[in-house]
């Protein structure tokens, strides 16, 4: 009887884990509308939590974000991510997108001026930016980081994108 209960519990856990949609790594538009809850019938939105390695200040201020999933820019890298170290322990992660991904990012940012976008890596938000001008370069900074966070993101990009 115990085995049946354990098997049943394991099945429920597996069902829960695999039923959650995993977002592709990329740039997504943030939904800041007043009613940004996800309705049961809506499939073009998802909730993204922040990666705790990228908290600056009070972690309670980092609420989950609602993002649109129907129009986004997937990360298609032309080369391995680069960690550029700056003052002290702070650095930034730079990625070189393929030509098609860079073109899509330019169109995406032109269409979504004055809106917020979020960089999602491994189904977690690592940075939120407000779009003022369209991005015109294939080499972009995706986040600032300190400590081991830069290495973590670089490793996740290399592993998930198989570059």
Predicted regions and their residues:
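Structural signature of multi-pass, alpha-helical inner-membrane proteins
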Residues: 18-163
